[in-house]
Amino acid sequence: LREAGIQAPILILGCTPSFYGKELMQYNITQACYDLSYAKALSAEAQSAGGTITVHIQCDTGMTRLGFLCDEAHMTQSAQEITEAVRLPGLHAEGIFTHFSDSDGSEEYTMMQFNRFLDIIQKVKELGYEFAIRHCANSAATLLYPATYLDMVRPGIVLYGHFPDRTMDPGL
């Protein structure tokens, strides 16, 4: 995309091996950072290249894939680890995000995830770090839950004219 002249911000939500740190810096691509060991690996790559990698901290509030765990049992530890990660040399922690696992289905579960996300943001803030960008709204949440917009939304499939769930009423 960069070689084609695209200058808009690019955020990789998946995992990029840390040895591609130079490319992340060269092309000014923001990388999701899902745990402290990955943050340390990205930091080492950035330092060895003499640059800075921009990251968004990924929080697992209930999707159970990648991210700092944000359930009640792990909230305090994750807040401490996130705070350590954002202070590593060579990293610029611009944002923090989570992903809703069922925002086109369960309002109760989506709101539980949203509240966990707000809790981790607050705990990290209490430890002295505030993120410029907070985001969690995927396609379904963009359509159904305006309260979850925060600083940015991530519509995906709706950009192609499809609804996240075939049973959703488009309301048109």
Predicted regions and their residues:
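Active-site-proximal beta-alpha core segment in soluble small-molecule metabolic enzymes
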Residues: 2-135, 149
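Hydrophobic side chains within alpha-helical segments
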Residues: 38, 116, 141, 154-157
